[in-house]
Amino acid sequence: MDLISEAIDIMANGGIILYPTDTVYGLGANIFNNEAVQRIYEIKKRDPSKPLSVLVQDTDSLELIADVNMNSREIVNKWLPGPFTFILNKKKIVSPYVSASTKVGVRIPDYKIARALASLFPITTTSANITNECTLSNPQEILRQIGDTVDLVIDAGNLNKAKPSTVIDLSSSKPTLVRNGFDSNDLDSIKDDLDKLV
């Protein structure tokens, strides 16, 4: 069994993985396993009222968990895969354990390994750190911070940029830049695209 298959099998059985993305290392769990999702909150010491984002393999998978209107579809199709999290209105299939609100943040990373991990089901994507502590770029440093809390580590070495994704809320008629995270050369261009939707 290769490492990707092993990771998927672990998550399918309620396990947690540490994995690389195009931005930072993430903590991954099957979003349909509420106990596993709760473990993510415990590992991060995160307030359960704060939502987790979801990683999907492609735009077809995205539309299974979130409502995508014509305007947001144009943005999603143009800018994903990429270092963005788009907040969309969630569908009922998304558990309140993942997001207690009516919205969900969705990612399709520009990183083949990360997308492959979500080939059978969507997974959580949240930075692998204790809440309010620094985001680290190296798996060994991450494990020193969060302890022996994950079931598998996919080690891609040091992620040089290691900055969080840029978060954009597309859930209403007026798109909003929520967080300017990853240093994207495309940020000005996507802002122009968002302005056209207003």
What are these regions (language model features)?
Residues 1-198:
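Active-site-adjacent structural elements in enzyme catalytic cores
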